[in-house]
Amino acid sequence: MQLEQIVEQAESAIAAADSPTALDEVRVEYMGKKGQLTELLKGLGKLDPSERREAGQKINEAKQQVQTSINARKELLKAAELAQKLEAERIDVTLPGRHSAVGGVHPVTQTIRRIEQFFGDLGFSVKEGPEVEDGFHNFDALNIPANHPARADHDTFYFTPSTMLRTQTSGVQIRTMENEKPPLRIISPGRVYRNDYDQTHTPMFHQVEGLMVDTDVSFTQLKGILEDFLNHFFEESLTVRFRPSYFPFTEPSAEVDVMGKDGKWLEVLGCGMVHPNVLKAVGIDSEKYTGFAFGMGVERLTMLRYGVNDLRAFFENDLRFLKQFN
């Protein structure tokens, strides 16, 4: 068969191929190991040497022409296949969108972040510590005597007589004062544990405590910072009172109340000036340095901010409840 005829047939077969598979069959038919053009190359040895070179050149040119046509047809088939696929998968952008089901930040976490942001702007750093504490950091260093009710089994979860789940994050303050020198400004958010469970108490809850130790720290500073914090947290100008109270680790001590919308006082946190015995327990000169401390229950603040009546709702993971905060 003449070379021109083979090329013409190949071109026709290529043009008729309507799929990559059919096109590959054409390639094998003409360019494969036993293809028609390949067989012509194998037959060059039978030609006279004077004709061999010219014949070989023509066959190679024919192969190149056929291969170029195959490549061009392959690109056309790919483009057609892509266009068909895009048409089949076309999205109608005029249709209404679907809302993605996304999670939200737990209201307790929102409150902690809000507290951290406020005190962070005042130069307080965030410190953390172990939730399993020893007696020294949880009680002794805080001027809590051995006969204090807080150390009783019915209030504290003990592992051994000397190790327990922490009942407040004050241990973080003690560890900070042991390892760092004044001036100090820290807050210590975290989980704490007490053996209590009712509408306003759970065995595990979150607390944020604050500590400032420096020269000439006064109750006036403490009062101003806490009043600013409460107005910022509740986003309104509140009536605040500091009611005298007692804590072993502060002297003087106070409970902080705010006036509710119903005209009744609501307790929100406790505070006071750091007791000299606490400073002495961690090696800080109580004649040179003074300090204040405060502590607040995160869940209680969250309840007051959002009008939640039962603290236990924060831990029941009811999405109908939690979605209200996001």
From Swiss-Prot:
A Gene Ontology biological process noted in the UniProt record is: phenylalanyl-tRNA aminoacylation
Keywords of the record, alphabetical order, are: Aminoacyl-tRNA synthetase, ATP-binding, Cytoplasm, Ligase, Magnesium, Metal-binding, Nucleotide-binding, Protein biosynthesis
Q: Where in the cell is it found?
A: Cytoplasm
Q: Does the keyword Methyltransferase apply?
A: no
Q: Which cofactor does it need?
A: Mg(2+)
Q: Which EC class heads this enzyme's classification?
A: ligase
Cellular-component GO terms for this entry: cytoplasm
Name the reaction it catalyses.
tRNA(Phe) + L-phenylalanine + ATP = L-phenylalanyl-tRNA(Phe) + AMP + diphosphate + H(+)
Cofactor note text = Binds 2 magnesium ions per tetramer.
List its EC numbers.
6.1.1.20
Q: Where does Mg(2+) bind?
A: 251
Record keywords: Transport included?
A: no
- A molecular-function term among this protein's GO annotations: phenylalanine-tRNA ligase activity
Q: Note the coiled coil stretches, chain numbering.
A: none
Can you tell me which family this protein belongs to?
A: Belongs to the class-II aminoacyl-tRNA synthetase family. Phe-tRNA synthetase alpha subunit type 1 subfamily.
Query: What HAMAP family has UniProt attached to this entry?
Result: Phe_tRNA_synth_alpha1
User: How the protein assembles, per its UniProt entry?
Assistant: Tetramer of two alpha and two beta subunits.
Which named protein is this? Phenylalanine--tRNA ligase alpha subunit
Species in which this protein is naturally found: Idiomarina loihiensis (strain ATCC BAA-735 / DSM 15497 / L2-TR)
